[in-house]
């Protein structure tokens, strides 16, 4: 049995970790290096860090922070945000990232996925998809969930995996920050189309949500931010609960 993963996520803007709901209303939470250190010690299986600053100055500051984060943790690190070219892959991998997450950059230039997979290997390329229901269809959104691309999300995700994405991080905009459980309907739809690991993101509110999530076929990891940042649930407590309930975890 493959062990399931618990992954905290840090959204970094102007050098600080921030958190919003349904991709809106961003609030300052903490220092990223301090937080990364805390999650590493708390038993997180991986850490995801997103650069949500679009400016050039912000990017330089983020690169500096990323290098510090990578030197402080001993778990796999996935980095995303502003990844538009192979040079961007180089930049974050040199900082110490293990995997690189592509989103809007790949929607703009789909060839980025096969090019990156060829250069770094599929295991290094994570497709991050921000998905929302529009007129009964799962649509993929760009620009941090602000722009409807009009594309069918399931077709886009399947294409990306066929062309080299080794993992999918599915962010449901509909359940993001709402803490009412993961978007299982959306996750099942994606799992029926791809066979690579899927990370579920958006909606975690309590430990039972993770237990329900891992009862669904094809879901390898649960990603959350708010509930961990605000210490409503510790990773240790969550993993012990899941383990006790028959979910294979690395304790």
Residue ranges and their predicted role:
Residues 60-67, 110, 150-154, 180-188:
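Charged helix-capping and loop-helix junction motifs
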Residues 91-112, 172-177, 200-209, 217-236:
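Glycine-rich phosphate-binding active-site loops on the catalytic face of alpha/beta enzymes
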Residues 5-9, 46, 74-78, 99-101, ...:
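Structural preference for beta-strand elements that scaffold enzyme active sites
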Residues 53, 61-120:
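Glycine/small-residue-rich loop that forms an oxyanion/phosphate-binding "nest" at active or ligand-binding sites
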Residues 12-14, 18-19, 97-170, 174-175:
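Conserved anion-binding
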């Amino acid at each position: 049995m493959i062990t399931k993963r618990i992954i905290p996520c840090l959204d970094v803007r102007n050098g600080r970790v921030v958190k919003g709901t349904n991709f809106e209303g961003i609030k300052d939470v903490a220092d990223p290096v301090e937080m990364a250190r805390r999650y590493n010690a708390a038993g997180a299986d991986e850490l995801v860090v997103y650069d949500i600053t679009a400016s050039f100055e912000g990017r330089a500051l983020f690169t500096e922070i990323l290098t510090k984060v990578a030197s402080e943790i001993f778990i796999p690190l996935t980095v995303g945000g502003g990844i538009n070219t192979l040079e961007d892959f180089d930049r974050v991998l040199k900082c110490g990232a293990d995997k690189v997450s592509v989103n809007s950059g790949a929607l703009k230039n789909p060839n980025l996925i096969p090019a990156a997979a060829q250069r770094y290997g599929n295991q290094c390329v994570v497709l991050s998809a921000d998905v929302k229901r529009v007129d009964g269809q799962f649509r993929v959104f760009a620009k941090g969930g602000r722009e409807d691309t009009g594309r069918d999300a399931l077709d886009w995700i399947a294409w990306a995996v066929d062309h080299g994405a080794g993992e999918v991080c599915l962010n449901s905009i509909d359940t993001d920050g709402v803490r009412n459980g993961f978007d299982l309907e959306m996750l099942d739809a994606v799992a029926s189309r791809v066979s690579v690991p899927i990370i579920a993101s958006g909606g975690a509110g309590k430990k039972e949500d993770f237990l329900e999530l891992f009862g669904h076929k094809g879901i390898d990891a649960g990603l959350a931010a708010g509930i961990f940042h605000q210490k409503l649930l510790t990773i240790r407590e969550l993993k012990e609960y899941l383990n006790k309930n028959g979910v294979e975890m690395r304790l």
